[in-house]
């Protein structure tokens, strides 16, 4: 934060969207303008040893005039022990500032539907679906973590791409050789199988945070799929089937209300992936707000503001103009 940002004295609110690979802070003035944006690394306590330092570091940047904060944190509500640690970190940092704390996917669902019924499927480093009936009842599907879950996530797509690459390199897969050269190019690896083998292991051995690095490969798979690379398209179609299963399960759990679906997370910025899910679950509803907007909406209500439909529309434009629309 620039030094002058500490001098902000007009009423403001803030939101934090804490994901597996990155964490975003947005401070919003009462006139609807953005006072500040900050970003740091992931804050999921399940696999980020520095999660507390990163989270409290952002919270310490808040202006003294902050009226309320809305937080959506990856991993929240999934382990009583870690949940207590997250709550402790937030309460210690915020003191008397009112706040709301929930799971990052719950926050994204509120943002997407503005409190109306719907099922939000999130695919970023991890994956999960969150459904709301608009009357206070919620359900979740997935979100079990990378060891035995996160189907359809960027991490799983990246890992499956690496598995495919290794099978091509050692001869177990001969029908998908068209994947070798373009994928190696995106990773900065030689496409010659003998050279690529050692280069890939070198890449692997130097990773500082393997889960995030593997998840980052998903965007390359998406680009290749958009450019008619058949093996890459197959990887995304597999992910789409997994994510569609999340949506169907949520709808089954709430049979008495119609649940349109929407999306959040970097992986689902891929038109190819969204279209593949739509083929199984119907056309998605464009989210009213990006995930961080859900935290700002909650904070605005908690601060006693009046965030009506026009306020939400204005916020969506403001966040989009600031490059925060996804």
Where are these regions (language model features)?
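ATP-binding/phosphotransfer module of carbohydrate and carboxylate kinases, centering on a glycine-rich
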Residues: 1-67, 112-119, 162-326
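Short, active-site-adjacent cap segments at secondary-structure transitions
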Residues: 77-79, 107-109, 128-129, 268-271
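Short beta-strand-loop/turn "lid" adjacent to the catalytic site in phosphate-handling enzymes
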Residues: 39, 44, 60-101, 110-113, ...
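Short glycine-rich anion-binding loops that position phosphate/pyrophosphate groups of nucleotides
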Residues: 21, 74-77, 125-128
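Glycine/charged-rich beta-loop-alpha catalytic/anionic-binding loops adjacent to active sites
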Residues: 90-98, 137-145, 276-283
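Active-site nucleophile and cofactor-binding loops and adjacent substrate-binding regions
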Residues: 99-107, 122-123, 284-293
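A structural signal for short, well-ordered beta-strand segments
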Residues: 71, 129, 263-265
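Glycine-rich phosphate-binding loop of actin/hexokinase-like ATP-binding domains
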Residues: 116-169
């Amino acid at each position: 934060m620039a030094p002058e940002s500490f001098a902000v004295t007009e009423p403001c609110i803030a939101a934090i969207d804490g994901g597996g690979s990155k964490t975003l802070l947005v401070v919003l003035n009462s006139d609807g303008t953005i006072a500040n944006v900050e970003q740091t690394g992931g804050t999921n306590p399940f696999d980020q040893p520095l999660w507390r330092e990163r989270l409290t570091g952002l919270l310490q940047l808040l202006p003294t005039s902050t009226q309320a904060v809305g937080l959506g944190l990856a991993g929240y509500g999934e382990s009583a022990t870690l949940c207590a640690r997250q709550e402790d970190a937030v309460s210690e940092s915020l003191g008397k500032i009112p706040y709301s704390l929930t799971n990052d996917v719950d926050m994204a669902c509120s943002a997407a539907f503005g409190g109306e019924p719907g099922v939000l499927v999130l695919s970023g480093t991890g994956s999960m679906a969150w459904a709301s009936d608009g009357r206070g009842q919620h359900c979740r599907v997935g979100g079990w973590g990378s060891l035995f879950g996160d189907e359809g996530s960027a991490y799983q797509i990246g890992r499956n791409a690496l598995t495919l690459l290794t099978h091509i390199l050692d001869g177990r897969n001969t029908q998908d050789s068209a994947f070798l050269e373009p994928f190696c190019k995106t990773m900065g690896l030689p496409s010659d199988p003998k050279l690529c083998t050692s280069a890939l292991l070198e890449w692997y051995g130097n990773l500082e945070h393997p889960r995030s690095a593997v998840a980052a490969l998903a965007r390359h798979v998406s680009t290749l799929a958009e450019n008619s690379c058949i093996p890459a398209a197959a990887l995304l179609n597999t992910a789409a089937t997994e994510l569609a299963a999340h949506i169907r399960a949520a709808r089954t759990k709430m049979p008495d209300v119609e649940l349109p679906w929407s999306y959040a997370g970097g992986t689902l910025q891929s038109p190819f992936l969204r279209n593949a899910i739509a083929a199984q679950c119907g056309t998605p509803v464009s989210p009213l707000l990006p995930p961080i907007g859900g935290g700002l909406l909650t904070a605005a209500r908690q601060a006693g503001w009046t965030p009506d439909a026009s306020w939400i529309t204005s916020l969506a434009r403001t966040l989009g103009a600031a490059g925060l629309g996804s």
